[in-house]
């Protein structure tokens, strides 16, 4: 059964400052930051070999498992900190740094969503987790839904934030030049260079990722094959996943809910966390 949730809560994010923790892309003094150094926490960090790459992940809390997946290119586990803080109160959270991000290696394979889904499965197998919920933002949302499509027996529910139908040719993300992106937040990239295992390959990884995205076809045919319940969350002002693309995905998914957050951008949870969390919490609690 499908259900449409319209959320217009306009609550801001909590403010906390923990200067020693990793910053995330675009972070400001007003941004939420956890007390925990997500994405760089040696106390909970693990590695797993997935095909050609060592994938880094962290485990928090106890209870039913849920995988948390950050955004792509400029994304990091730290940006998902408020979700992890909330979920870890009564869930086991597996926060994965996807290949090429944070402390995970880049490898030699194209960083496709099929490959990233395989990486998620490798983590779950190492942790001996038979079935799980997944929550992802943007690139992480596409990875989560690809996992649900390719590994339905291991998927319970999926929360996909900022992700809609992506028809080949509909978006062109540029020529893959890393420098303009590096200048958007130099402090973030300087810090990332200190934890990434292959910092000298960042520009090449970035170009390879952009080339993949420019040819990506994540169409209704994929969404129609996802049997697990999916909650799509989108900001009303999302320019990366415009409303019409999310509506298209919603119509194609066999079992979907939709939450539209009024006046929110692509990272809707960064500006309207309580509104997003209310939808996520209710969805995950449903039998």
Task: Identify the role of each PLM range.
Residues 95-135:
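Active-site loop/oxyanion-hole signature of alpha/beta-hydrolase fold enzymes
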Residues 237-241, 266-267:
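Acidic catalytic loop of the alpha/beta-hydrolase fold
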Residues 226, 232-234:
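Short beta-strand/loop motif that positions the catalytic acidic residue
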Residues 263-287:
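Catalytic active-site module of serine/aspartate enzymes centered on a nucleophile-bearing elbow/loop
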Residues 251-267:
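Catalytic histidine neighborhood in serine/cysteine hydrolases
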Residues 49, 53-103:
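Conserved HGGG/HGGXW glycine-rich cap/lid loop of the alpha/beta-hydrolase fold
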């Amino acid at each position: 059964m499908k259900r449409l949730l319209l959320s217009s809560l306009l609550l801001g994010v909590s403010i906390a400052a923990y200067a020693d923790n990793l910053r995330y892309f675009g972070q400001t003094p007003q941004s939420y930051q956890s007390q925990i150094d997500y994405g760089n926490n040696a106390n909970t960090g693990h590695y797993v070999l997935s095909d050609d790459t060592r994938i880094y992940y962290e485990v928090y809390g106890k209870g039913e498992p849920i995988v948390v997946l950050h955004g792509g290119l400029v994304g990091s586990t730290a940006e998902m900190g408020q979700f992890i803080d909330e979920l870890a109160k009564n869930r086991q959270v597996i926060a994965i740094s996807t290949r090429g991000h944070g402390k995970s290696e880049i490898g030699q394979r194209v960083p496709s969503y099929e490959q990233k889904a395989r990486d998620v499965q490798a983590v779950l197998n190492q942790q001996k987790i038979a079935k799980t919920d997944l929550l992802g933002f943007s690139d992480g949302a596409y990875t989560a839904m690809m996992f649900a499509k390719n590994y339905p027996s291991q998927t319970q529910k999926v929360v996909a934030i900022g992700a809609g139908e992506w028809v080949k040719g509909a978006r062109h993300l540029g020529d893959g030049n890393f420098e303009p992106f590096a200048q958007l937040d130099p402090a973030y990239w300087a810090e990332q260079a200190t934890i990434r295992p292959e910092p000298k390959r960042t520009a090449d990884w970035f170009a390879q990722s952009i080339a993949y995205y420019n040819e990506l076809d994540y169409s209704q045919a994929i969404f129609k094959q996802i049997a697990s319940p999916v909650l799509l969350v989108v900001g009303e002002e999302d320019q990366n996943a415009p409303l019409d693309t999310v509506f298209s995905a919603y119509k194609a998914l066999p079992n979907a809910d939709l939450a539209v957050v009024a006046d929110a951008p692509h990272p809707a949870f960064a500006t309207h966390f309580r509104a997003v969390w209310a939808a996520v919490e209710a969805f995950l609690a449903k039998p």
